[in-house]
Amino acid sequence: MTLTKMLEELPRHCDICAKKSSKGHQQYWRGYKLHLDVADGQIPISAVLTSASVHDSQVAIPLATLTAQRVTSLYDVMDSAYDAQEILEHSRGLGHVPIVDPAHRGRKTKNVIVPGKQPRQLTWAEEKRFQERTMIERVNGRLKDEFGGRFVRVRGAVKVMAHLMFGVLVLTVDQRMRLSE
């Protein structure tokens, strides 16, 4: 499937989404979600805007394909939301090494007399590289707090994307200036 077709299939209408916070409370928001792919140095490379209810894993393959067309990278570092075989295979198909935090589905460990298959764990080298993933959290935080991404007061996906991309542009310039110091 082509990149254009993959991006066209992603919903871009305004809707409502909910998730459970780390403290167990439901959080709700209405609108859109900006998915970013970030390189070393906290430089945004690719961005895709979708409906708020789109799960991050649905955007992983188009976003990785878009980024692969723009830069040469060695690793795809992702959190446990992206722990799916299709995403890992696509990353390898692009010539990247996927480093994904293993998903802990079911959350509770069961005591069994006969041990089954051990859950996948990151190697020490993968854990070291995975620490770089906190970079995207800092980029998202700066985009929201410093560059107007928290409250966008326009309607329509095109206008929202334009406002967010102005923030991403300024964030990129600011980050490049920090790196050159």
Regions found by a protein language model. Give the residues of each.
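Residue-level detector of flexible, active-site-proximal loop/helix-junction positions
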Residues: 51, 105-106, 158
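Charge-patterned, long linear interaction tracts outside catalytic cores
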Residues: 151-181
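Helix-centered, glycine/charged polyanion-binding patches within enzymatic domains
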Residues: 80-148, 153
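Catalytic-loop motifs flanking and including active-site residues across diverse enzymes
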Residues: 59, 135, 139, 162-165, ...
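Polybasic low-complexity intrinsically disordered regions
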Residues: 1-93
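Charge-dense, low-complexity intrinsically disordered segments
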Residues: 54, 130, 156
